[in-house]
Amino acid sequence: SDCTLRNHDCTDDRHSCCRSKMFKDVCTCFYPSQAKKELCTCQQPKHL
């Protein structure tokens, strides 16, 4: 059950992002310009 590193793909497991002592990375989804399906990557939370 390895966690998903920052900026890595979490499309198939939205709750897999790694957590540190301070915060948990958030699986953030977007649609690349030519893509038919969304792409999700683990990102640092925006409010920090």
UniProtKB/Swiss-Prot annotation:
InterPro entries: Spider_toxin_CSTX_Knottin_CS (IPR011142). The keyword Secreted applies. One of its GO terms (cellular component) is extracellular region. It comes from the Eukaryota. Disulfide bonds join 3-18, 10-27, 17-42, 29-40. Keywords: Disulfide bond, Knottin, Secreted, Toxin. Expressed by the venom gland. The keyword Disulfide bond applies. It is found in: Secreted. One of its GO terms (molecular function) is toxin activity. Contains 4 disulfide bonds. Its main location: secreted. Belongs to the neurotoxin 19 (CSTX) family. 12 subfamily. Heterodimer of A and B chains; disulfide-linked. The presence of a 'disulfide through disulfide knot' structurally defines this protein as a knottin. This is Toxin CSTX-15. The lineage of its organism: Eukaryota, Metazoa, Ecdysozoa, Arthropoda, Chelicerata.
